[in-house]
Swiss-Prot record:
It comes from Polaromonas naphthalenivorans (strain CJ2). The gene is nadK. Involved in the regulation of the intracellular balance of NAD and NADP, and is a key enzyme in the biosynthesis of NADP. Catalyzes specifically the phosphorylation on 2'-hydroxyl of the adenosine moiety of NAD to yield NADP. Belongs to the NAD kinase family. NAD(+) binds at residues 73-74, 147-148, 175, 177, 188-193, 212, 246. Keywords: ATP-binding, Cytoplasm, Kinase, NAD, NADP, Nucleotide-binding, Transferase. GO terms for cellular component: cytoplasm. Its EC number is 2.7.1.23. This is NAD kinase. GO terms for molecular function: ATP binding; metal ion binding; NAD binding; NAD+ kinase activity. It catalyses: NAD(+) + ATP = ADP + NADP(+) + H(+). InterPro entries: ATP-NAD_kinase_N, ATP-NAD_kinase_PpnK-typ_C, NAD/diacylglycerol_kinase_sf, NADK. The keyword Zinc does not apply. The keyword ATP-binding applies. The active site is at 73 (proton acceptor).
Length: 291
């Protein structure tokens, strides 16, 4: 049986060693399954693979039934923010380190991907985050995130003081190195290493995690994602806000960072029988060494 997906876009971690040969191998495999293959424009330019049509994110959104991301979670985050608005489903083939959201190993991708192309898959939808920086009543920066929005102190400065509001209600003033607002997807990233809990992807919530707080009673808290979280810069030098650790806004005193749930979702496709708990067990090495 041929693929149910006619037009497939390939997006690669082109900086990685061996990425060109991996992408060529996958493209040939997709062609043998009856797919018409296009390469994302930066991937094509940086790998020298010129034998396939090239598309930007908007072109992928308009012309492709499926996007195949070959790389690590960072590669997925970068293209995911651009593709979510188009509703194109995404499959991740891992060539990175951890691979929470690029969960198909390259070494056995053909056996895993072939049934998925025939329609045998699990779909997993994740809400995006929409953020903006407001200065003197005017929006000076906008960004979308899949994992997290992080407010950080400057590299050579002391702690920042942050005023936190949820749905217009004052929560607390926090003195810390920073603060993370993470989605369920991002709860296994920076937020986890800062001591936050893991949120199951089905939970319509965020986790608010302080980074090295001055007060030990300042603990992570789980919030609904249906409202608005606002972080105001009260004190501290050279603060910044990052979005999935890939775009950055420089902040001034009085700036307010507003975070809401986006109207867009990422559509992840996983192999049939996929389980979030299988992913946690594998990636976090649970049960290893247990008799």
């Amino acid at each position: 049986m041929k693929s149910q997906f006619r037009h497939v876009a390939l997006i690669g971690k082109y900086q990685a060693q061996g990425s060109r040969s991996a992408l060529e191998d996958i493209a040939h495999f997709l062609g043998a399954q009856g797919c018409e293959v296009a390469l994302e424009e930066d991937t094509a330019r940086n790998t020298g693979l010129t034998q396939y049509p090239t598309l930007d994110a908007a072109g992928i959104g308009a012309q492709c039934d499926l996007a195949l991301v070959v790389g690590g979670d960072g590669t997925m985050l970068g293209i995911g923010r651009l593709l979510a608005q188009f509703g194109v489903p995404v499959v991740g083939i891992n060539q990175g380190r951890l691979g929470f959201i690029t969960d198909i190993g390259f070494e056995h991708y053909q056996n895993t991907l072939a049934p998925m192309l025939r329609g045998e898959f699990e779909e997993d939808r994740r809400w995006m985050m929409q953020a903006k920086v407001v200065r003197d009543g005017h929006c000076v920066f906008r960004a979308t995130a899949m994992n997290d929005v992080v407010v950080n102190r400057g590299a050579t400065s002391g702690m920042v003081e942050l005023r936190v509001e949820v749905d217009g209600r004052f929560v607390a003033n926090q003195r810390a190195d920073g603060l993370i607002i993470a989605s369920p997807t991002g709860s296994t990233a920076y937020a986890l290493s800062a001591g936050g809990p893991m949120l199951h992807p089905s939970i319509a919530g965020w986790v608010l995690v302080p980074i090295a707080p001055h007060t030990l009673s300042n603990r992570p808290i789980v919030l609904s994602d249906s409202g608005e979280v606002v972080i105001e810069i009260v004190a501290g030098r050279d603060a910044s806000a990052s979005f999935d650790q890939q775009s950055l806004a420089t902040l001034l005193h009085g700036d307010r960072i507003s975070v809401r749930r986006s109207e867009h979702q990422m559509r992840f496709l996983h192999p049939k029988g996929w389980s979030y708990f299988d992913t946690l067990r594998k990636k976090l090495h649970w049960n290893e060494g247990v008799a």
